[in-house]
Amino acid sequence: MAIDIFQSLKNCVFDLQRADVQNYQQPLKQLARLLNSENLQSVNAHLTRNVELDTFLARSEDTESSMAGSAVLQWPDEPADILGLKLLLIEKMADDNNFSFNFCHTFFYDRNIIESIRKFTSSLVAPFVRDYQLYVENQHDPEPAVFRPVSRKIFIVHGHDNDALQSVARFISRIGLEEIILSERPDGSRTIIEKFEAESGDVSFAIVLMTPDDSGSALASESTRLRARQNVLYELGYFAGKLGRGKVLVLRKGDIEIPSDLAGVLYTELDEHGGWKRKLLSELAYAGVPFDKDKALSA
């Protein structure tokens, strides 16, 4: 049961990440149906026994100010209660299309509704499916066996655009984090792969700069597209596997080709006005990476 149903849950998450506003409800409803499988009823009852969704939503809505995107979800302290609330949220969103629109617009605000839904998927649904599986497999105990402090090291994957690299690196430094840039680290008689593995070993988050440094096309095509360098794509895949997609943010510059295999990875535009900074801060906060919030306001 575990292998099949959890793989099916992950497939629903992947479909949600690729969905548009017309068809996102289908994978969401399928996700809710899978979570309500008979084999999981006792698990779900245990998770939801101490939580009330309406109370949670009311407390969270009270945090909203006049500024769009200001509302913050008021999660409880207990990991099992958090899982229970997320489970109830998914069920309610699958059942009520208007609620899902309003919820995503309020708590996962972005430039349009589908971007808000995708942000909800990557920030809430994907981590829920991961933690839900761990909860079931570890005899209903969501607590990790060992607590370690979260690293302040942020790996920056980059191509040839030095201006973009320095802009992001300076911002990371200003908010009290340590940027890891492979080209600036000593070689120490190591091969590139050895150096990469060592320097990326204890980072907590990765920022991938997809800048138009190369161009290419399929053999059958007469036109070319701007692309990121091959090392950037390799390192993106590495960190998505090592850290999980929720701890990797792609900053895309210009109209460059995004490989279809990376459709489920979160990315935002590296705009000239610094709008990417707000997105990055939001993702760092959700990933649990500690940064200086006071300095972030002026960085």
Curated annotation (Swiss-Prot):
Q: Which GO terms describe its molecular function?
A: NADP+ nucleosidase activity
Which keywords does the record carry? Plasmid
List the InterPro entries hit by this protein, alphabetically: CAP12/PCTIR_TIR_dom, UCP032620
Protein name, please? Answer: Uncharacterized protein YuaY
Recorded source organism is Escherichia coli (strain K12)
